[in-house]
A protein has these predicted regions:
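Phosphate/pyrophosphate-binding loop motifs in nucleotide- or prenyl diphosphate-using proteins
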Residues: 18-206
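Short Gly/Ser/Thr- and charged-rich N-terminal loops/segments
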Residues: 4-14
């Protein structure tokens, strides 16, 4: 049975994971350090698959934090789209590739292309980057850098997971592009808010 029919995309992912529209938040089934993947497989909560989609969830929270700031409406729209895609990725990573028969939302090539197009548009208005940039400038820019670092961690974990289990290659590509997008977004927001972009000057002994 496809539980995703006629539900908004974000709700679809939650219903895929929870399998029912109404369920208690606490189940007590994880009290001994195990949790269930989509498909029913029980694994330790420190399993790399759990680490992977847990880090994607952490990333999504940071994306939400950025979207709540006073930034351009267009950026907010794109960030909400990214949040939806991260739920899709979370559902994909939470499914046991060998046992899950439930329909999981799809990540598309168009989702990756959107990030690339957004980066290209933002870069048109930015000064050429000739040096490494120190994270910071103002609070919102710093949030972008925090999200970027969490995104890189999520990417590293999914790459490690893919060495021993199936992971849709579009997932790792999307996370790679997203970390770049967050870097460019931070620069764009910094430029729009007249934040100082501090460059890294290596200290070299003469």
């Amino acid at each position: 049975m496809d539980l995703t029919t006629n539900l908004p995309s974000g709700r679809r992912t939650y219903n895929v994971i929870l399998k029912t529209p109404k369920m208690k938040i606490y189940t007590k089934t994880g009290d001994k350090g195990l949790t269930s993947l989509i498909g029913g497989t029980r694994v330790a909560k420190h399993h790399i698959r759990i680490e992977s989609y847990g880090t994607v969830d952490e990333l999504n929270s940071y994306i939400g934090l950025i979207a709540c700031q006073e930034i351009e409406a267009h950026h907010q729209i794109i960030l909400k789209e990214i949040q939806d895609r991260l739920f899709t990725i979370g559902a994909s990573l939470a499914a046991d590739p060998e046992k899950s028969k439930m329909k999981i939302p799809d990540l598309l090539e168009e989702d990756i292309l959107l990030l690339e197009q957004e980066m290209d548009k933002m870069n048109e208005d930015l000064p050429e980057l000739k040096h490494f940039v120190l994270p910071g400038g103002n609070t919102i820019v710093s949030y972008c850098h925090l999200a970027r670092c969490v995104c890189r961690r999520a990417e590293r974990l999914t790459v490690a997971l893919a060495e021993g289990s199936f992971v849709d290659t579009k997932v790792t590509v999307y996370l790679n592009r997203l970390s770049d997008y967050l870097f460019v977004l931070g620069r764009k927001i910094g430029d729009d808010t007249n934040a100082v972009e501090n460059i890294w000057v290596p200290r070299v002994k003469s």
